[in-house]
């Protein structure tokens, strides 16, 4: 009871501070932007959720699908600018745009970015973190386009669409070149594409195996606690 009361007080305070705000400030922290998004779009925020391997929401689902494609996630460390990161971001935004719309998806995406400005034509960066932000922005945009064209699609269908686009057109990744970070749009080979499709074929619409699905237990209070914990761990 004490836990719930504490977070109700925090929510009320947040509403007083952020109510009426529809756009983010340039120097606004990620935590603040995420709280603002949740206040302005509570239904979408609940469906999108926070990443947790034990939860079913768009964010967790996108991570499960991406990690289980079998694509590379080790090239740069911390899943920054990798193939898995590209699929995760594009699928996440596609799912939001498909369920809601591209505007909601863009707001959700920007809430989790430190730098919201997409610098067209800038392919070289001084740090891995900045390069990762740049590829996320581009993959987010691709995902929104795919999701908007497939309204009310389940995430397994969207995952297949993302992989198809990756194979035919390409997604954005980052790599270190001469002590700088370079971003580029690359295609999956036909072999990588076929293998990734095979790997996700055995998953359900939430990216879970049959065993995971059978053992999954939902609980609103438990999910709220885990989401709050995940938000606290967000680095600004």
Regions from the PLM with identified roles:
Residues 2-11:
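Bacterial N-terminal signal peptides that target proteins for export
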Residues 23-106, 210-236:
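Glycine-rich short-loop/terminal segments
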Residues 82-160:
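Catalytic toxin/effector domains delivered as secreted proteins or via bacterial secretion systems
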Residues 146-236:
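Active-site or metal-binding loop neighborhoods of secreted/extracellular toxin and effector enzymes
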Residues 18-20:
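C-terminal motif of bacterial Sec signal peptides marking the signal peptidase cleavage site
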């Amino acid at each position: 009871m004490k836990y719930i009361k504490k977070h109700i007080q925090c929510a009320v305070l947040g509403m007083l501070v952020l109510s009426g705000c529809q756009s983010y400030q340039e120097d606004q922290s990620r935590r603040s932007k995420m709280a603002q998004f949740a206040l302005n779009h509570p239904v979408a925020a609940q469906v999108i959720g926070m990443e947790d391997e034990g939860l079913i929401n768009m964010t967790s689902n996108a991570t499960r699908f991406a990690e289980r494609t079998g694509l590379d996630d080790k090239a740069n460390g911390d899943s920054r600018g990798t193939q898995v990161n590209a699929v995760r971001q594009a699928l996440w935004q596609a799912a939001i745009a498909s369920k809601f719309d591209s505007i909601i998806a863009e707001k959700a995406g920007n809430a989790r970015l430190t730098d919201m400005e997409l610098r067209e034509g800038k392919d070289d960066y001084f740090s891995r973190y900045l390069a990762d932000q740049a590829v996320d922005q581009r993959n987010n945009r691709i995902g929104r386009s795919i999701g908007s064209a497939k309204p009310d699609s389940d995430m397994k269908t969207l995952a297949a669409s993302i992989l198809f686009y990756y194979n035919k057109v390409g997604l954005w990744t980052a790599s270190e070149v001469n002590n700088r970070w370079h971003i580029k749009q690359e295609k999956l080979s036909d072999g990588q594409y076929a293998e990734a499709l095979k790997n996700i074929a055995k998953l359900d619409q939430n990216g879970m195996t049959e065993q995971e699905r059978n053992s999954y237990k939902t609980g609103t209070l438990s999910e709220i606690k885990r989401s709050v914990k995940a938000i606290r761990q967000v680095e600004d």
